[in-house]
């Protein structure tokens, strides 16, 4: 009968994974009977730790490291979402070449090929579910969100590049309600039950009040501002951050 087995592995003098030195190890799970192999599963993993604090910012393996990044959609001209492995790795290489060390994957689960590229090339990744813009009340909709979050975490928790689980994006575009706030608290709880080792985060739309009930739900928060794009000037970013 099917069963679960937990094994603790000791890796002496491990070569740590980081964005600058993305060292990977291959874990092999092999199904055997009477010394005969029936199946193999190969998984690349990295050994690393990270912290995020208000005063110290982001540190990986104890080294303070500023995060500079971009957001990425899984999309190309004439291909749409159907990207090849080469496309995924080319995207990652281009992002690396501009000097970024962080990628936010908007706003849905991306291909395993791109997560693998982030593992091997070296990025801190924010992965999120497609819970965006407008909240749909009711048990069925929330059950779907929980299922999406569960799949995202369970399918990707071995990727050392993933540091942050995003629970929603600009959800207050459609307004706020008590149910919306409660559903976010439940998603936060679910994330911590499935993976207590990683940070959770949320992306607020620009007009979200800085003192409302949507704050302090996740470990980290961000604001999507479009100064110099939809309105204002690029120079407005600094004063807003100072005020925030």
Positions of PLM-derived features:
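Secreted/periplasmic carbohydrate-active enzymes, especially glycoside hydrolases
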Residues: 1-112, 116-125, 148-151, 163-164, ...
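Active-site beta-loop-alpha junctions enriched in small/polar residues
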Residues: 72, 108-110, 130-132, 168-170, ...
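Acidic-and-aromatic substrate-binding clefts and catalytic sites of carbohydrate-active enzymes
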Residues: 103-111, 135-137, 142-143, 208-210, ...
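Short low-complexity, flexible loop/linker segments enriched in glycine and/or proline
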Residues: 117-121, 140-145, 215-217
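Short hydrophobic/aromatic-enriched beta-strand-loop microsegments
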Residues: 122-130, 219-225
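Active-site cleft segment of glycoside hydrolase catalytic domains centered on the general acid/base Glu
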Residues: 135-142, 168-195
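Active-site groove signature of glycoside hydrolases
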Residues: 148-178, 206-208
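Extracellular glycoside hydrolase catalytic/binding regions
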Residues: 182-244
